[in-house]
């Protein structure tokens, strides 16, 4: 078994930080002498990882949104390169975050010859498909979370294992609606809509004004309607609350606990991303929103080659959940859809049935192995 092996792990966003921390906890429980360092956030720090940088505080996406933080990202990249050169780890685990991590993989493999596992694949099936050539050259093992990704990598000759989706296990432990409302202090018998604007600063700025106006229109039809807004750890709560002040809306703000908020709701409006898949796995009636800067939108229209943005729709290869994107992402369209949805119980039943099938396809029971087993297999047998 590994003895005092050195592992470096890099997770640049909050969701990756959380998933990586779960892996670290499993590794530390069995191999307490493992030396683990890298880039991450509060979850990896709490799991005992020595952090070189924390990039989860600078959660941005898009062409224009990233510009103010370029110096920070460059410094973090130089710092982790120096750390790899000094530490010479037995294994480098890269978690999602492809713009940063694929550059790091190239350096770590070509310059230092480090063994690399990449967990949570870049979305090469959506855009930048040529990245697969770099992956083939630099990554020793892909650990993918969607079954169809395994086929893509196998066809390209890249070593790959489907390790199940980390959210399935997390969702299995989630509270039901009644328990969720009780734990959050929400009323048991009133209609509640959860509003999830995203975890990036640019998403907050673009989505929350739309969500506030949507909530106001919906409340005109149903004054008893309440809203719950989970606030990501990357966001200043006061900034979110300010948008809702003096709007005559009944809103409960919760720090974190997005899954609990979605479980407690009757319906969810969620920004495209990890939370939208969490909502789908909860089998919760929902719709997906997203609005970016104009330049990012134009670039996406040109480069992205998939029909859908929501992960649940991509996986199903059909529009099982409606998407309100860019110019369609507005209060009038959203409120009209939600009002019609609530007046037609068959829509909810159909959506829930489809989401249940999706959830089963991503379960760990379908996986080749666990991420933990995959990582342990790649660590050296130092005492052998």
From Swiss-Prot:
Transmembrane segments: none annotated. Coiled coil: none annotated. One of its GO terms (biological process) is lipid A biosynthetic process. It catalyses: a lipid X + a UDP-2-N,3-O-bis[(3R)-3-hydroxyacyl]-alpha-D-glucosamine = a lipid A disaccharide + UDP + H(+). Keywords: Glycosyltransferase, Lipid A biosynthesis, Lipid biosynthesis, Lipid metabolism, Transferase. It holds the Pfam family LpxB. InterPro entries: Glyco_trans_19. GO terms for cellular component: membrane. Its EC number is 2.4.1.182. Pathway: Bacterial outer membrane biogenesis; LPS lipid A biosynthesis. GO terms for molecular function: lipid-A-disaccharide synthase activity; phospholipid binding. Belongs to the LpxB family. NCBIfam families: lpxB (TIGR00215). Condensation of UDP-2,3-diacylglucosamine and 2,3-diacylglucosamine-1-phosphate to form lipid A disaccharide, a precursor of lipid A, a phosphorylated glycolipid that anchors the lipopolysaccharide to the outer membrane of the cell. HAMAP family: LpxB. This is Lipid-A-disaccharide synthase 1. It comes from Legionella pneumophila subsp. pneumophila (strain Philadelphia 1 / ATCC 33152 / DSM 7513).
